[in-house]
A protein has these predicted regions:
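Symmetry-related core transmembrane helices of the 12-TM Major Facilitator Superfamily/SLC fold
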Residues: 166-183, 384-402
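Helix-loop-helix hairpin linking two adjacent transmembrane segments in secondary transporters
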Residues: 140-187
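Cytoplasmic helix-loop-helix junction between adjacent transmembrane helices
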Residues: 107-144
């Protein structure tokens, strides 16, 4: 009994320290969402160049997720998580001294390692909890996505007070302090590691399972779309509605905050109602929101008996923000429900599978800001970003419709993965 209480206490401590650390990592990872705006002005970048700048941390953070997930299975989450955080401190600090576009791109790639912490923390946290509580635990950890909102609350104030160069220095100190706190308040359980008799190649055999690629596509929508919009919305408010940086970041946080914090709710709902049903409804909510958000401001000329009447159709900033809030809430729940699939169907390879799925979501978050900028340069229509997202949701709905049996409640067949010896 005493041993069970100690295990529960350690599990709660691991969950708390990991969630806090992931929140800080995500805040650093999303730094260019705000920092990129004064840098864009300073360097005279076009929209596509800004999109590439904002997306560079997402690229590296995505690419490292697979090896980090595998290393977590092999060596344990505590040492890998700590190592990732420590390795980003110097690159983040050096951003404050960058003066050329290529320097920002290179340092952005290096700071992007912070985004790989998700592939470490997910299996690390999940293995401390039984399956019936795993969805909620992973949802609580995933609420660290709210670090994006933290950046939007804190970064404009720091830039206004001390200039943009101060922001990366403050974030570097915060990352160092967080890494040390995590090491002090986390634990290692060797029983959670995949035995050395299981090779990396054996762990990667899950890639032959079609379900993995299905979940990659879903996650590229709910997480990739979230990251892409989190990076883009501050600039969108500035350009579309004329808000200053502080007000634009605050309004953008109305999307980022629920999109992160409510992930825990998604884990709880998925535990109760099943991953399929929750993900299905999430996609439909996103479909409706993106359809409405994609409609550009339009002036219609209507011929009436009294002459020509001009009718302006456009979303006010408040209606726009309300729709973003709903979409962010749905995405938060969807991020947890997709990982509920993984926890249920791949219990022996959570690290490898979550790394692959996280890679797909992260690559979506990398590609989308670049495409947002390219579409804006090509069309001049800011809402083209939502037209693109609307199309990706359509793909998910069609894929879900033809991939699952209608009832969606029957358990999936056993995973074809390498069992730990």
């Amino acid at each position: 009994m005493k041993s069970d209480r100690q295990t529960d206490r350690r599990a709660l401590t691991v969950l708390t320290s990991s969630t806090f650390s992931f929140t800080v990592c995500f805040a650093v990872w999303m730094m260019f969402a705000v920092l990129g705006i004064p840098v864009k002005k300073m360097l005279g970048l076009n929209e596509t160049q800004f999109g590439l700048l904002a997306a560079m941390p997402v690229l590296s953070g995505s690419l490292v997720r697979v090896p980090l997930g595998i290393w977590t299975d092999r060596f344990g989450g505590r040492i890998v998580f700590f190592g990732v955080m420590i390795s980003t401190v110097i690159p983040v600090w050096l951003i404050g001294y960058a003066t050329a576009y290529w320097q920002f791109l290179v340092l952005g790639l290096l700071l992007g390692l912070a985004g790989g912490c998700f592939a470490v923390g997910t299996p690390y946290v999940a293995r401390w909890f039984p399956q019936e509580r795993r969805g909620l635990a992973m949802g609580i950890f995933g609420a660290g996505n709210s670090g994006s909102a933290v950046t939007k609350f804190v970064a404009p104030a720091i830039i206004a007070a001390w200039g943009w160069q101060a922001l990366p220095r403050v974030f570097a100190v915060a990352m160092l302090a967080t890494a040390l706190l995590f090491w002090c308040f986390s634990y290692t359980n060797p029983a959670h590691n995949v035995p050395n008799t299981t090779s990396f190649a054996a762990q990667l055999r899950v890639l032959k399972d079609r379900r993995v690629w299905r979940y990659c596509q879903y996650y590229s929508v709910v997480f990739g779309g979230y990251v892409g919009l989190a990076l883009w919305m501050t600039k969108y408010y500035v350009g579309q509605y004329g808000f200053d940086l502080g007000a634009a970041a605050l309004l953008a946080a109305c999307f980022s905050l629920p999109g992160g914090v409510l992930r825990a709710l998604g884990g709880w709902v998925s535990d109760r109602h099943g991953a399929y049903k929750v993900t299905w409804w999430v996609m439909w909510v996103c479909w409706v929101c993106f359809f409405l958000l994609s409609y550009p401001p339009t002036t219609m000329q209507v011929q009436t008996v009294d002459g020509t009447v001009a009718i302006d159709l456009a979303l006010s900033p408040w209606v726009f923000t309300a729709l973003l809030f709903v979409a962010g809430t749905a995405m938060a729940i969807g991020k947890a429900s997709v990982f509920k699939f993984i926890g249920d169907e791949f219990p022996d390879n959570i690290g490898a599978v979550s790394g692959v799925v996280g890679l797909a979501g992260g690559l979506g978050g990398f590609v989308l800001p670049i495409l947002f900028g390219a579409l804006l340069d090509l069309t001049g229509v800011r809402s083209s970003a939502f037209m693109l997202l609307y199309g990706t949701v359509c793909v998910s709905l069609v894929w879900m419709h033809y991939s699952f049996r209608p009832q969606g409640a029957a358990p999936a067949p056993a995973a074809t993965v390498a069992k730990a010896a």
